[in-house]
């Protein structure tokens, strides 16, 4: 039986009067399980990325062509990150190359597919929608290290630190951890995702946990989190 533990919580906004209380509120960290993998979440203020254990011998065989539209399995139905596998690689995981698609614009249709192929240093990700749009990128296997390709190219005024992405394998699963630090006017925050990939029932099972933290000038602090799991059917290439 596939399982995942949802950590979805109602939005919390904490208004605190003293700096000491604020530090206490922001220093909390937690541990969750994402598709049976233990994930430790450091305080977002520490700047420490979420990095899981990694062993290349534990990498799964993900080779195959899958439908871009999946079947919801469990967790938060309102989460849209996994509605389309190509868009998940592009927007949630910020995978370099996926955004280089030339016209026509990508359309999420039942005919759209995403193919994964093991190559030296990671996986090649190829997407096509059956109507002319296509893109190809590489997801590196870094054994827990940070992806250098995710830094300078993704930095801008609102995200001065760019994107920090780590990848690795554990428990027969591929994991990808992405951290986006942002600043806007008097506010700042962090968006973190941990995605777990593994073969399941002839297809591809993807589980993702999202944690979003932000702080403003009042001072106020908010946190939102969710977990969702979606299965993508394999199709003939």
Q: What label would you give each PLM region?
A:
Residues 29-118, 200-237:
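Amphipathic/hydrophobic helical signal segments and adjacent flexible N-terminal regions
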Residues 1, 11-17, 194, 200, ...:
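Small/flexible residues
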Residues 8-14, 32, 133, 163, ...:
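Short, intrinsically disordered low-complexity segments
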Residues 16, 23-24, 28, 141, ...:
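Generic detector of low-complexity/intrinsically disordered segments
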Residues 1-29:
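Sec-dependent bacterial lipoprotein signal peptides
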Residues 100-201, 231-237:
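Contiguous, well-ordered beta-strand patches that form the walls/edges
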């Amino acid at each position: 039986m596939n399982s995942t533990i949802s950590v979805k919580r109602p939005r919390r906004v904490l208004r605190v009067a003293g700096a000491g209380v604020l530090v206490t509120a922001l220093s909390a960290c937690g541990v969750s399980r994402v598709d049976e993998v233990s994930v430790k979440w450091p305080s977002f203020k520490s700047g420490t990325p979420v990095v899981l254990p990694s062993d290349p011998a534990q990498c799964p065989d993900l080779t195959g062509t899958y439908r871009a539209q999946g079947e919801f399995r469990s967790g938060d139905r309102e989460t849209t990150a996994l509605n389309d596998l190509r868009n998940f690689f592009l927007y949630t995981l910020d995978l370099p190359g996926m955004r280089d698609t030339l016209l026509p614009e990508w359309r999420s249709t039942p005919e759209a597919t995403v193919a994964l192929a093991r190559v030296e240093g990671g996986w090649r990700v190829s997407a096509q929608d059956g109507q002319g749009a296509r893109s190809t990128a590489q997801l590196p296997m870094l054994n827990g290290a940070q992806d250098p390709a995710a830094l300078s190219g993704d930095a801008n005024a609102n995200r001065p630190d760019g994107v920090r992405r780590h990848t690795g394998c554990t428990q027969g699963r591929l994991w990808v951890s992405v951290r986006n630090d942002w600043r806007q006017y008097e506010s700042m925050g962090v968006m973190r995702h941990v995605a777990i990939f593994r073969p399941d029932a002839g297809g591809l099972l993807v589980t993702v946990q999202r944690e979003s933290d932000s702080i403003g000038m009042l001072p106020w602090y908010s946190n939102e989190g969710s977990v969702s799991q979606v299965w993508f059917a394999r199709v003939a290439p």
